């Protein structure tokens, strides 16, 4: 049975720029917005776009990510002839081989892709915050009779040198690709989202492997090769909210934008829901001494302090006299009596001792996964 389009989510990144937050978990598994993990956005987009089969390619610290995704039922992706498949590096005849790049990860999973037998493959990154209708992108791909379509976002010219830039003609056909150009000619930045005709991509990957030609990365190798060979390569112009949360600053900023009154992500739009794995938690407890303003407090929280313009994820315990402002507190964290937290990200299960001050006025502060700050080990 042939499936029209298979989605492949690249979720093996370490996310080194997130520092302590990714010491024990993969970047796509990092929490976001109080009740989500970053990969929930790509998975929810797939579900909302009517994609039945999704392969999630993992590598670095996959335990939390694998447990979170499970069989895909939280996104309605389980059932006959549909589902989510976790794809990890495996030992082949030549021995264990890590993925060497984005397109190499696809090549290593050719057997899985062939078992689905798609006409098209949709390549996604598992570490961006956005909503996109991939079915709409596929229609543009078909209308242009394209071999490859690249989703692009218009960025300010002063920021264009940070991205892979697509230079196009008047019909949105890509005529040149520049990787982080010093003097960009265009502001169309690649989002790392691609639709390929699978038979053509498959042939290129197999031929390059057999010929010992480096085709390990989509941006550095595959897209330039497509353009050089005269393939029909087009852009899909995306105009919605999109955030690369690859740094501490951008992750904090995205969470603060998420709780804005005019949320640019439009998270309250029920026609395009963001799904996640459900965890049963007791109701919140907000004491008579607590003061909560302009904040998101998720189930299971115990709040007896002051919270202003912040996110408290599930099961956060905030003791009396503590103050939290402009911060993102991940699930299971404990904030001690009289602690003061400003402009910070507090990791899952972290413990902040009594009267500890964490001030990110000059630079966003981070407390890592299960990290303990200001608590004596003597007891």
From Swiss-Prot:
Q: Write the record's keywords in alphabetical order, separated by commas.
A: ATP-binding, Carbohydrate metabolism, Glycogen biosynthesis, Glycogen metabolism, Nucleotide-binding, Nucleotidyltransferase, Transferase
**Matches recorded under CDD domains:** ADP_Glucose_PP, LbH_G1P_AT_C
A single GO molecular-function term is: glucose-1-phosphate adenylyltransferase activity
Q: Which SUPFAM superfamilies match?
A: Nucleotide-diphospho-sugar transferases, Trimeric LpxA-like enzymes
| Enzymatic reactions | alpha-D-glucose 1-phosphate + ATP + H(+) = ADP-alpha-D-glucose + diphosphate
Q: Which GO terms describe its biological process?
A: glycogen biosynthetic process
- Asked whether the keyword Ribonucleoprotein is assigned, the reply is no
User: What is the designated name of this protein?
Assistant: Glucose-1-phosphate adenylyltransferase
């Amino acid at each position: 049975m042939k499936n029209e389009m298979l989605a492949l989510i690249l979720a093996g990144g370490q996310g080194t720029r997130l520092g302590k937050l990714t010491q024990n978990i993969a970047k796509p598994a990092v929490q976001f917005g109080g009740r989500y993990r970053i990969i929930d956005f790509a998975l929810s987009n797939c579900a909302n776009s009517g994609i039945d089969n999704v392969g999630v390619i993992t590598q670095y610290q996959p335990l939390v990510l694998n447990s979170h995704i499970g069989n895909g039922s939280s996104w309605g992706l389980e059932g006959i002839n549909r589902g989510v498949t976790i794809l990890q590096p495996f030992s082949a005849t030549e021995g264990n081989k890590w993925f060497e790049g984005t397109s190499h990860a696809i090549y290593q999973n050719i057997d899985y892709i062939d078992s689905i037998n798609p006409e098209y493959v949709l390549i996604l990154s598992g570490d961006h915050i956005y909503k996109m209708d991939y079915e709409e992108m596929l229609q543009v791909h078909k209308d242009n009779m394209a071999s490859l379509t690249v989703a692009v976002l218009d960025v300010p010219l002063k920021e264009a040198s940070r991205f892979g830039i697509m230079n196009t003609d008047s019909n949105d056909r890509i005529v040149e690709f520049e990787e982080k150009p010093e003097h960009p000619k265009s502001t169309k930045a690649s989002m790392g989202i691609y639709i390929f005709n699978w038979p053509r991509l498959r042939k290129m990957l197999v031929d390059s492997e057999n010929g010992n030609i480096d085709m390990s990365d989509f941006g550095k190798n595959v897209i330039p090769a497509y353009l050089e060979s005269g393939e029909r390569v087009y852009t899909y112009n995306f105009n919605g909210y999109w955030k690369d949360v690859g740094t501490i600053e951008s992750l904090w900023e995205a969470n603060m934008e998420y709780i804005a009154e005019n949320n640019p992500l439009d998270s309250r739009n029920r026609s395009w829901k963001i799904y996640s794995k459900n965890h049963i938690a007791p109701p919140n407890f907000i004491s008579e001494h607590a003061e909560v303003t302009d904040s998101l407090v998720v189930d299971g929280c115990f709040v007896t302090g002051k919270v202003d313009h912040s996110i408290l994820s599930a099961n956060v315990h905030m003791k009396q006299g503590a103050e939290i402002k402009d911060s993102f507190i991940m699930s299971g964290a404990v904030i001690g009596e009289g602690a003061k937290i400003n402009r910070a990200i507090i990791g899952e299960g972290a413990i902040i001792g009594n009267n500890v001050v964490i001030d990110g006025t000059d630079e966003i502060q981070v407390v890592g996964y299960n990290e303990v700050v200001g608590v004596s080990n003597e007891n």
